[in-house]
Amino acid sequence: MPTINQLIASPRVIQKSRKKVPALQQSPQKRGVCTRVYTTTPKKPNSALRKVAKVRLTNGFEVIGYIPGEGHNLQEHSVVMIRGGRVKDLPGVRYHILRGVLDTQGVKNRKQRRSKYGAKRPK
């Protein structure tokens, strides 16, 4: 417990909580351009080739975004929209790329949870 004199010399500092998605800067989504589209492998118990893209955002940040769903049409210079949301088994991936927005096409033949993958209603 500090003394009164110690508190006068150096007052208590309020600890700031760490932001989970700093690149969004309080926005719900941000637009960006893909600089690299590639696959990477997940952490230990899991095994796969996860599709990710390095994205340069309009505010200058460079982030890694996960491409959800089966199959995608992204390549370098594709314009994409990102949202927050990490991928637990991919270290450093703290954003998701939105499907069916801007240059990203929706997932083909998707019947359930279509809104999450930008898929139109089947006829």
UniProtKB/Swiss-Prot annotation:
Keywords: Methylation, Ribonucleoprotein, Ribosomal protein, RNA-binding, rRNA-binding, tRNA-binding
Presence of keyword Cytoplasm: no
PROSITE patterns membership: RIBOSOMAL_S12
GO MF entries: rRNA binding; structural constituent of ribosome; tRNA binding
A biological process from GO: translation
3-methylthioaspartic acid: modified positions: 89
Record's keyword annotation contains Glycoprotein: no
GO CC field: small ribosomal subunit
The protein's assembly and partners: Part of the 30S ribosomal subunit. Contacts proteins S8 and S17. May interact with IF1 in the 30S initiation complex.
Function as written in the Swiss-Prot or TrEMBL entry: With S4 and S5 plays an important role in translational accuracy.
Family designation: Belongs to the universal ribosomal protein uS12 family.
Name of the molecule in the record: Small ribosomal subunit protein uS12
Protein species of origin: Nitrobacter hamburgensis (strain DSM 10229 / NCIMB 13809 / X14)
